[in-house]
Structures are given as structure tokens and as C-alpha cells.
Amino acid sequence: DRIALWLPNTPAHYALTFAVWRLGATVVGVNTRFRAKEVEDIVGRSGAKALIYWPGFKDIDFAAILAAIDPAELTGLQMVVAHDVDGMPDVPSQVLGRPVHRLSAMLSAEPMAADHGGAKVPAQIFTTSGTTSKPKFVLHAHASLEEHARRVAVHWGVDADDAVFLQTAPLCGTVGLVNLTISVAAATPQVIQTLFDPVEAGQLIKREAITHAIITDEVLVRMLEGEADEVPYPSLRVVAAFGINPPLEEHMAAFERAQIKAFNAYGMSECLAYMALRPIDVPVDERMYGGGFVVNPASGIRIRNNETGELCVAETSGEIEVNGPTLMLEYADNPEANANAWCEDGWLRTGDLGHLRPDGCLVYISRINDMLRLSGFLVSPAEIEAELEKDPAVDQAQAVSINTERGVRAFAYVKLSGAGSFDEAALKAHCRAQLANYKTPISVVPIDEWPLAISPNTIKIQRAKLRDKAQALYDSSNK
């Protein structure tokens, strides 16, 4: 059985996660930023038997979102559970044609003595974008989550007697879930932010004497700039800041002045966050780049030249392949994706570009297929492009990512069909209504011709050139 949790980070979300695992069922994580199309697809294709949500969270109009979902697409859904808290809007007796139960009423039930979980029992499904517009379902068993949590906790020092962890990553993703499990494995207190707010985060760090956190480098720099003291967070020792963006040296120097050890890492939903970690007690230039050493000695990383099919020697870049106990069981219900992902000897193709140093340290470079990392989530450009191409005026769309003062954002180019009038505001409004807000392009710009790379076998759009052009256009208009 699968249970969809469409919830923010709350104690109830934590309790429900462990409750589902104890039942021997599987959690399907659903981002609260998702809207009708995404929720319908994930809950429907996963076959989730129950959907649990918080009707009054963040003033989100959940009723309108649910009303836009076709109940017939949710063939497995049997019930809806409302996380009822003070001030929650009235909940109807039925949603999507299914009965609604209140979570508070369930708490009066007798505790279940049995534990149906187990090492090989499926525990968690993460959704991850692929080369098509529909996300894949990454299925993990209990064993990969538990063993990994214990090792990461030790490596990161979360097992220290005075450790307190600040959870800022959403629990629906691999980073947030691993953060939860490492705190539990180490019996370390965790402070939860339901919605990440940098000002509140700074206050919590001071008030709760937080020692460990995951905060992107851009946000942490802004937090430090807003403080009068050079060392505003004396308790904060270690921050995972993977996804570090330029200017690397300036950001890391700011962290060092604040006596914060920031480090990078490598991971993905398929092999879990923090599969490889940069050492903490090493010079700054050894901590700032993506990659690291495997946390579990039973794990392996190798690099393959996809043109020749041969494995690469040290310092030679190619596709990263991984193996070991942190790997997913499979892409659930997706034979085609599994066939493409696994090597014959059981190693997993990541779609990432990188190389190994002679000492075995992984150096991560980028996604091979130019996936977009927006608001900490990996997003397929095809997902954004498909929505833009629904407009009669758009013949073809291409989405890339650019750096802005508010972080990495999507930027789209469209070739017009001539069948209608181009309306940038309407296109962005459509994306905002159908997709999570962070997937909405910051700009949609018409283009006459795509930059192409022509080879004997294929003709490919040069996304790197589009990205450079988009960045230059944005920079020139925001001087």
C-alpha cells in the first residue's frame, strides 16, 4: 500500500512518516508547492490509497486545487485525511468523491503493537524529473535509509552530545528525509521550520543553540550580511551548502569569517542525499565543490566514457555511475526507466558528469542533460516546455536556468507558431496555475531560430548557448 503525504514539515508529518513505515506501507512524498496537474499525476500514477493534507496551510487554496483534479484519475485512492489544527477551514465530508477523516480523531485509536516494516520492505517514494514531463518514482527500502542515516550522522558530527539540527529542507525530498533520519539515528534534537524563512532561521539558530543545518550558500550569505556581528551564530558549527553557486570563493570566505564550516556533497534521490561528502576538517578549497568521498565503504563510484563505453581513468570526465547499499530498489512501475538506468552489473547510471581524483574523491561537474535545479529541486525542462507549448501561439519551447539575485530561476524561449498572438504574461500565468511556482519562468522570450549542433547522427539544440544568451539578457536588463 502507498500513502501520499501532501504536507509541509510539521511534527505530524514526521509522526505520519514513521506510522506509515510501521504499517509496512510506503510513503509517497508530495510537495506542498505542487498544484492540480502535479498532484493528480503523482497520486494517480502511484496508486496511493490515502492522501493526507493540511487544508489551511500557508493560505493555499487546497479546495480549488483539489476541485481541479479529475477523481477518475485517482483509481487507487480510497480515503482523504485532513491534518486538522486550530483555525483550519471547514472540511467537507467528502473530497474527490472519497470520505474525509480527521487526523485528530485517529489519535484516539489504540497504539498498534505490531511493526510490519523490515529491511527489504519498500518505505519511501521520491518523485524526480526525468527526460519526459512526468516524474519518475524513486523507491527506497528501509535498509538503505537506516544504514545511511547512521553513517552520515557520524561523518557530519550530528551524533555529538550538544548537537541540535535545523531542518529547512522539505521532507518530501531526499535531503529533507535524510536530515530527519540522521537526527533520529543520532538521537539529536531537531528544530523544524514549516516554511523556510531566513530571518526566523537566524533567530532559531541563536535561541536553540543550533549546531548543524542545511542552508544554501546564497541564503546563508544574505543571513550573515543582515547581522551586525562578524560571528552572529556562535553555536553553528557545520552547514551543508551543496548546490554552492558562484562566487564560490567569496561565499566560503564569508562563512569562514563567521566561523562556520560549510561543505559540499554529492547525492540524488536514486542513491540518497550525502552519498558522498566532502570532509569537514580540511581547507576551504577542498570543501566548496560538489562531490566527495563515499560515506559507506561498501558504496562505489566510477566514471564511464559514454562515447567509447569504457571506464575512465582518474581525472577524466564522464558519466558518474554508482553502486552500494544506498541505492534505490527501482523506479516504481516504470520498466522503461529501469532498463535505461541500470548497467548489466547492477551499477546505476546517474546522468551526472564528473571525474574521480587519484585519491578516490568524486568531483561533480553538472547534469549531463542540463536538468534545472530550482529552489533545491531537480526539474525537467520538458515539464515547463510542455506547459508553454499548450498555448496555440507557441510552436516549440526551451527552458534553461539562469542566476538571479533571488537564486536560480527558469528562463524560457519560444518559437512562435503564427497561429495566435504572443502574450508573455498569459504564458507565465498559465505555468503558475499548472505547476509549482518555482518552475514558472522568470521570462518568456520569442526566438526566431534555435542554435543547433549538427552531427552525422543528430541535430541538437545547443542549450548552453541558450542559457548564456538568457543570462546576458537578464543581466543587461537588471543593471
Regions found by a protein language model. Give the residues of each.
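Conserved AMP-binding A3 loop
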Residues: H116, A123-E147
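Flexible lysine-rich "adenylation lid" loop at the C-terminal edge of ANL adenylation domains
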Residues: G309, I447-A470
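Conserved AMP-binding/adenylation subdomain of ANL enzymes
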Residues: E146-V164, C172-H212, G226-E227, E270
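Structural core segment of the AMP-binding/adenylate-forming
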Residues: L23-H101, L416-G420
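Gly/Ser/Thr-rich phosphate-binding loop
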Residues: A185, I210-I214, L224-M288, G300
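Conserved ATP/PPi-binding loop(s) of AMP-dependent carboxylate-activating enzymes
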Residues: V294-A298, E310-A341, V379
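Conserved AMP-binding/adenylate-forming
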Residues: D1-K37, G44-G47, T168, L378
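AMP-binding/adenylate-forming catalytic core of the ANL superfamily
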Residues: L5, F34-D41, L51-Y53, A213, ...
